[in-house]
Amino acid sequence: MSTNIITTEGHEALKKELDHLWRVYRPEITQKVAWAASLGDRSENADYQYNKKLLREIDRRVRYLRKRLEDVKVVAYSPEQEGKVFFGAWVEIENDEGETMKFRIVGYDEIYGRNDYISIDSPMARALLKKEEGDEVVVHTPTGEATWYVSSIRYGQGVSTD
């Protein structure tokens, strides 16, 4: 089960996606379905079948987004978070071999398509919560334990640790 929290930026992105699907993409596909239906026999009409399927997928996503936007709690940055890892933080960590990782801890709905975002529900994020720069973090993974050290913690929209 995923945690029902989201960053302000993530919430805005979901609202933007919903708006685009409902105002732009769905009307476009609805027109294509109507055009394909006007051609006659729908049973062998690939355009009709494809666009009808696409319309169902759009409607499914719209329902999901509407429900999700009602259910999630937006967690905004607070100055009290400075110096420790909390939700929304950009974190850089390093291990004993000198390997580094940089990422932001966000909600479940925000991680897709982003290599630099991890879910608050991930083992790494859970291990990092409330840690400070210089702290050692032991992460329990399916392959065993991994030890990392917190190199830097930053907050802010669009902030990266690059």
From Swiss-Prot:
Gene3D superfamilies: Transcription elongation factor, GreA/GreB, C-terminal domain (3.10.50.30), Transcription elongation factor, GreA/GreB, N-terminal domain (1.10.287.180)
Gene Ontology terms: biological process: DNA-templated transcription elongation; regulation of DNA-templated transcription elongation
Keyword line: Coiled coil, DNA-binding, Transcription, Transcription regulation
Taxonomy, superkingdom: Bacteria
GO molecular-function terms, A-Z: DNA binding; RNA polymerase binding
Keyword Transcription found: yes
Pfam families for this protein: GreA_GreB, GreA_GreB_N
Coiled-coil spans in chain: 52-73
Functional summary from the UniProt entry: Necessary for efficient RNA polymerase transcription elongation past template-encoded arresting sites. The arresting sites in DNA have the property of trapping a certain fraction of elongating RNA polymerases that pass through, resulting in locked ternary complexes. Cleavage of the nascent transcript by cleavage factors such as GreA or GreB allows the resumption of elongation from the new 3'terminus. GreB releases sequences of up to 9 nucleotides in length.
PANTHER family: TRANSCRIPTION ELONGATION FACTOR GREA, TRANSCRIPTION ELONGATION FACTOR GREB
Family per similarity comment: Belongs to the GreA/GreB family. GreB subfamily.
Name the record gives this protein: Transcription elongation factor GreB
Native organism: Pseudomonas putida (strain ATCC 47054 / DSM 6125 / CFBP 8728 / NCIMB 11950 / KT2440)
